[in-house]
């Protein structure tokens, strides 16, 4: 039996530690994140190396400062060839790595760039046209629709909803 730990690495852009109920925010409900905090590790004394999503992701996946790996703005990140992502190192060590969401660590500034050797065996990336939720084929909107929820109601209402996705 494999005794290596199972690693679930969640990245939520611009989310502070105090936006999770289990870590002290009594105003919101985050039951799934609360359960992860109870059963895993919650880092409550950490700092983000860059407030912009692409440089931040590139930094924590390479272990390097964004300025040292040409990851300074969104959409124009061209990592040097010598940079190896932690996911590639994990895959080389026998882990099965998967990505769901968006990564944005290869350049899309002028044209589509092929994926780097990132170590992901499963890669479910969808960036709906122009970051818009209502773009055709957006899996998140389709999932909401299957649940009988109109995303407009969630994002345009001042009401507190009883949706527990986080």
Locations of the language-model features?
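Active-site segment of extracytoplasmic enzymes that catalyze sulfate/phosphate-ester chemistry
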Residues: 9-11, 17-100, 109, 118
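Extreme N-terminal starter segment of soluble prokaryotic enzymes
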Residues: 2-8
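Catalytic-site neighborhoods of secreted/periplasmic enzymes
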Residues: 64-166
């Amino acid at each position: 039996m494999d005794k290596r730990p199972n690693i679930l690495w969640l990245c939520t852009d611009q989310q502070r530690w105090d936006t999770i109920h289990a870590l002290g925010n009594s105003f919101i409900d985050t039951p799934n994140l609360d359960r992860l905090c109870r059963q895993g590790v919650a880092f409550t004394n950490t700092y983000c190396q860059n407030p912009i999503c692409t440089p931040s992701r590139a930094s924590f996946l390479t272990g390097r400062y964004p300025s040292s790996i040409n990851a300074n703005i969104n959409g124009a990140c061209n990592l040097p060839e010598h940079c190896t992502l932690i996911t590639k190192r994990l895959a080389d060590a026998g882990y099965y790595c998967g990505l769901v969401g968006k990564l944005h660590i290869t350049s899309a500034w002028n044209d589509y760039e092929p994926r780097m050797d990132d170590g992901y065996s499963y890669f479910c990336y969808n960036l709906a046209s122009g970051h818009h939720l209502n773009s055709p084929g957006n899996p998140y909107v389709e999932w909401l629709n299957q649940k009988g929820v109109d995303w407009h109601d969630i994002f345009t209402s001042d009401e507190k909803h009883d949706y527990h996705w986080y």
